């Protein structure tokens, strides 16, 4: 079971680095708007704030442009574009802008609609006869508008994309085979491949290519002569940045290879400079006009920047743009994240104000800081009053626990509440009245926290967290209003089974200590179905006593090999080698989780591998009663196991997958079933892992062999380039 857990965690770790979320727009303390004569001091404050944040987040370099009233009022490079040689960033340094590309693709669509070449309510099949979806009703009704507003019903299907082995038509076909996670138009689900389909449909409608249309219809008329859609062109320029990631645990900056995504180019392939991107912002702020020439109709701009679907709370999505309010002002924005680069484009139409921030590090939160700082300094923050009196913040202080066992801390700092999430920066909580708060800078947009009494238990408190990917309830476990708890290692309820008794029954259920210890190694052959991705995998998962583990997987789509992954852990150190992503070395919490989870004798050694074991409460999994056991290691992340009261086998596991470089912790749930006795040991032949990023991943064991002679080098980094 532990080997399957590592397989699923590995793929989720990759997904973390590709996750794109809207950026926060944050309220600030009252501050008057800057006047034209005050720009110098306001711009100096902006630069100071962002330089401090850049250094804090380990960002080698960035370039910022600010546009106000159709004029560039700030344009500067900060830091370095080449970390190794310390070459400075300039205003003309090219960076990858990632998903900020989507607004350009949407612009091409509305331009084409202006010309009558297509309608936003056309079916993509009109231009792409091969386009289809697994849901036949959705396939019959889906429109270009649905593709451009992330409401196709599909979860992210990025796995096939990142391998780089499929062309655009193949990627679209793979997405069409993926199992949907919602009905058409039911909810917002970020979808890169649907944007690739939209861009390809526009190209077919115009009898051209997406790259040519971007150059002809947008770059050329805007004078964006320092922009491109291909890495090869970027690298031929005289001034471009390398891309990097930064490990917050080891403080190491690493150069990354640039990711070419020609097949999904309409979703994120543009490279540009701050100077060029100023022209793009001017076009949007001038309602489709640049230097007196109209490039797109006012109706087209309205389509781009009006609500097409709600994401969560006040956060909406247009066509290629996130939409919301900031102190009564409409804000239109979109971030971008791709290997080694992160971007933020944002503008405030009624203030004729916008900016572009380009950085050379993966998955940075600095865009949120830029937005809040620039709005505060140049627009000003009027005094505001909450819709209802704020409750006493002191009573909200304490620890809150996610279903996956991750603890969130709420504390007071300068008489204001702060939410701290493991592995992330602290988020100030801004009161919206009563016990409702907005998560401040640098939280992603659309995150809100409401403290409330537990239903039918008014004396206890819970935290209701609203987020774009789905809401979650966290139970308060310490502080006023917390459910009473006991010392670690005991039961949370005296009527529950003790930890020692539970472990004894589990050991017996899995085959007994003698049977478990008689084996010294195992090799499992597995088939994996990424149901919501349209991708499959086959491979082996190997383990050897006392705590060595390895995995070798081959991924396929449309019957074609698209990639490989090897993971390895020798008992002390390890990592991952992939054909489609940079090599990863385990560190920080990720390494600690691997250490705790790789013990060959698993449940026999839980007491040694985890600092605390606590039977928290009773629960149900699929109608079956379970004990919920929390496992906490010294430095890793907590795990919740749901153990059948009948069979004493683990039916479900809640945990988190950590990426030290992407700076995320992604909750996942795994369900274990089809237990079979293999040479005296119970093995779950089916595992279903679920996360917001990957959807359902179904793993089936096809063969188990015990006590195979596995050489030491199987648990070391591969010596060849087989997996590159």
What are the residue ranges of the model-derived segments?
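N-terminal mature ectodomain segment of secretory-pathway/periplasmic proteins
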Residues: 207, 501-504, 508-582, 608-617
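A short, polar/charged loop-to-alpha-helix boundary motif
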Residues: 81-90, 365-373, 660-669
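Catalytic loop of the DD-peptidase/beta-lactamase superfamily, centered on the K-T-G motif
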Residues: 28-75, 159-162, 203-216, 238, ...
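Flexible, processing/modification-adjacent segments and terminal tails
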Residues: 385-391, 490-502, 507-508, 568-637, ...
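Gly/Pro-enriched, hydrophobic low-complexity segments
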Residues: 441, 558, 622-718
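N-terminal leader/targeting segments and the immediately adjacent pre-domain N-terminus
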Residues: 2-10, 14-89, 95, 111-119, ...
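Active-site helix/loop module of the DD-peptidase/beta-lactamase fold
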Residues: 61, 91, 96-100, 112-155, ...
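Short, charged, amphipathic alpha-helices and their helix-cap/turn boundaries
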Residues: 42, 46, 161-183, 208-225, ...
């Amino acid at each position: 079971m532990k080997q399957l857990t590592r397989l699923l965690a590995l793929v989720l770790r990759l997904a973390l680095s590709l996750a794109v979320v809207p950026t926060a727009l944050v309220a600030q303390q009252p501050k008057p708007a800057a006047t034209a004569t005050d720009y110098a001091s306001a711009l100096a404050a902006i630069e100071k704030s962002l330089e401090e944040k850049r250094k804090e987040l380990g960002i080698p370099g960035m370039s910022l442009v600010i546009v106000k009233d159709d004029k560039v009022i700030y344009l500067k490079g900060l830091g370095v574009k080449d970390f190794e040689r310390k070459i400075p960033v300039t205003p003309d340094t090219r960076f990858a802008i990632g998903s900020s590309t989507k607004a350009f693709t949407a612009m091409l669509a509305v331009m084409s609609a202006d010309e009558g070449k297509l309608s936003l309510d056309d079916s993509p099949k009109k231009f792409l006869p091969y386009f289809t979806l697994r849901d036949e009703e959705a396939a019959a009704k889906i429109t270009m508008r649905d593709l451009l507003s992330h409401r196709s019903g599909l979860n992210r299907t990025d796995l096939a994309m990142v391998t780089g082995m499929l062309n655009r038509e193949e990627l679209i076909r793979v997405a069409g085979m993926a199992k949907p996670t919602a009905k058409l138009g039911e909810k917002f689900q970020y979808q890169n491949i649907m944007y690739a389909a939209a861009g390809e449909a526009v190209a077919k409608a115009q009898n051209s290519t997406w790259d040519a249309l971007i150059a002809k219809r947008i770059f050329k008329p805007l004078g964006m002569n320092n922009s491109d859609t291909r890495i090869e062109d970027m690298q031929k320029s005289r001034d471009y940045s390398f891309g990097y990631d930064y490990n917050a645990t080891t403080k190491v900056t690493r150069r990354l290879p640039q990711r070419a995504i020609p097949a999904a180019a309409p979703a994120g392939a543009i490279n540009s400079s701050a100077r060029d991107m100023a022209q793009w912002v001017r076009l949007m702020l001038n309602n489709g006009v640049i230097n007196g020439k109209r490039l797109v109709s006012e109706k087209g701009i309205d389509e781009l920047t009006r609500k097409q679907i709600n994401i969560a709370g006040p956060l909406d999505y247009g066509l290629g743009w996130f939409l919301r309010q900031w102190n009564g002002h409409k804000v239109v924005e979109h971030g971008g994240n791709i290997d080694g680069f992160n971007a933020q484009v944002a503008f405030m139409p009624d203030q004729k104000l916008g900016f572009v921030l380009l950085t050379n590090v993966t998955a940075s939160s600095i865009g949120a800081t830029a937005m809040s700082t620039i709005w505060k300094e140049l627009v000003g923050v009027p005094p505001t009053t909450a819709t209802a009196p704020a409750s006493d913040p002191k009573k909200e202080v304490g620890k809150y626990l996610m279903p996956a066992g991750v603890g969130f801390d709420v504390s007071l700092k300068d008489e204001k509440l702060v939410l701290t999430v493991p592995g992330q920066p602290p988020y100030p909580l801004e009161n919206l009245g009563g016990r409702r708060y907005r998560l401040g800078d640098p939280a992603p947009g659309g995150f809100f926290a409401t403290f409330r009494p537990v239903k039918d238990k008014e004396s206890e408190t819970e935290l209701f967290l609203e987020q774009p990917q789905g809401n979650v309830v966290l139970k308060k476990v310490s502080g006023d209003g917390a459910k009473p708890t006991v010392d670690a290692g005991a039961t949370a309820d005296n009527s529950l089974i003790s930890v020692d008794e539970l472990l004894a029954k589990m050991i017996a259920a899995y085959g007994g200590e003698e049977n478990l210890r008689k084996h010294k190694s195992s090799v499992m052959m597995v088939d994996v179905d990424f149901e919501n991705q349209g991708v499959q995998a086959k491979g082996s998962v190997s383990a050897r006593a006392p705590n060595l583990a390895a995995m070798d997987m081959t991924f396929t789509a449309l019957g074609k090999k698209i990639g490989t992954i090897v993971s390895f852990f020798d008992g002390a150190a390890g990592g991952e080698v992939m054909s489609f992503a940079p090599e990863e070395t385990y560190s920080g919490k990720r390494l600690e989780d691997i250490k705790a989870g790789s013990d060959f004798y698993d449940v026999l050694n839980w007491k040694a591998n985890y600092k605390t074991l606590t039977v928290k409460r009773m629960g149900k999994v699929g109608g079956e009663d379970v004990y919920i056991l929390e496992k906490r290691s010294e430095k890793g992340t907590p795990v919740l196991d749901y153990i059948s009261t009948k069979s004493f086998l683990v039916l479900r596991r809640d945990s988190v997958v950590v990426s030290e470089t992407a700076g995320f912790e992604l909750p996942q749930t795994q369900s274990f079933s089809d237990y079979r006795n293999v040479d005296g040991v119970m093995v779950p032949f089916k595992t279903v892992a679920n996360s917001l990023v990957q959807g359902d991943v179904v793993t089936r064991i096809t063969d188990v062999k015990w006590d195979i002679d596995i050489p030491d080098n199987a648990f070391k980094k591969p010596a060849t380039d087989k997996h590159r």
